[in-house]
């Protein structure tokens, strides 16, 4: 079983965690000019 050789400092652990981020969906402009999320139905026109 693998065991850490030495303790990881708070700073080093925080630097590693900077890459753990949530990617937000990018809104797309629809044909009628309103913004919507991709792969969602437009509530005004009913189009996908």
UniProtKB/Swiss-Prot annotation:
InterPro entries: Ribosomal_bL32, Ribosomal_bL32_bact, Ribosomal_zn-bd
GO cellular component: large ribosomal subunit
Single Gene Ontology MF annotation: structural constituent of ribosome
Region feature Disordered, mapped onto this chain: 1-48
Superkingdom of origin: Bacteria
SUPFAM superfamilies according to UniProt: Zn-binding ribosomal proteins (SSF57829)
GO terms for biological process, alphabetical: translation
Sequence similarity: Belongs to the bacterial ribosomal protein bL32 family.
Protein name, entry field: Large ribosomal subunit protein bL32
Gene name per UniProt: rpmF
